[in-house]
Every structure is written in structure tokens, then in C-alpha cells.
Amino acid sequence: LEMESGNTITTSSEITILAPQVVHAGRSAADLTEEATFTGCILTMVLVNDVVGVGGYLEGELRARMNITDQAKDIRMELHSTEKSGDREDESVRQRVSLEKDVQLASERPYVWAFSLPVPERTLPTVQSGRTSVSWRLKAVVDTDTANAEYHLERKVQIFTST
């Protein structure tokens, strides 16, 4: 503040504190597990965490128990982003990692694939503000030779930035 004479009475500063979303310890494995049942298999995704900073990693396991024997062309994890602004919407695959290719999956046998999917360092965080939003989904895909038998499972994840 200044007086009419030009003498400064007080000065002020603005401080902005940015903090990542708080993740509470003690979340159960069930909180971080997603499961889908298909005629041909049961697909389960178990995450280490579903809230990650840019440049970090989404990690966990993809599990499958086959009800039929099937040939998988590709088993992969994908990170999808959806950006909405008003009536416009843009969805894209931001990251993809193949866990295994061309493998026969036998019935009644459990399969487990560990994964570590990097989150891009330069990206938008999860945000919802009026008619503008950015959201993220982690998708597990078991792409098979059987017609129309792509097994997939999705889970919303949160991405944050820090300075």
C-alpha cells in the first residue's frame, strides 16, 4: 500500500503452494483391483497405485484365467487420455507397452504379467473445471485370434503435475 505522498506503508506478496493429491496409506488391494468376466476368460488388473505424477510409472499386474484355450496375438497395457472442452472431445493413446505376443493361453491355467507403464513427462494432469476436463484411463487388452474376442478392462487413474 502507498500513501498519496508516495510513501510505502506495507508490501505484500502472493505465494502459491502446489501439492500433489494426498494418497492415504492403507488402501486395500481391493481398492486398486479391477476385474471383468468374459465367456472366454476372467481378466484382473491389480495396481500398485492409481494416482501418479507426470514422469512416474503406473505399475501392477495383469492376471488372466482362461475358460477356453485361445491364441493371444498381443497382451498389452495402454494409457488413454480424454480432453474435453465444451462440445469438443479428443481421445488418444498416450502410452502403450506390450507384455507378450503370440502366446497360447491354456484353459484353467492362471497367467500373470507384471507391468510398468511410464506416464509422459510433458502432459496435462487430471482436471475438471466447468465444461473443460482432462481424464485418464489405464486399459488392459488381450487381443486374440478368435473373432470378436478381444478381452479388455479399463480403470480411471489420476495424473498430477508438480513444480
Task: State where each predicted segment sits.
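C-terminal beta-sandwich interaction modules and adjacent acidic
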Residues: 1-163
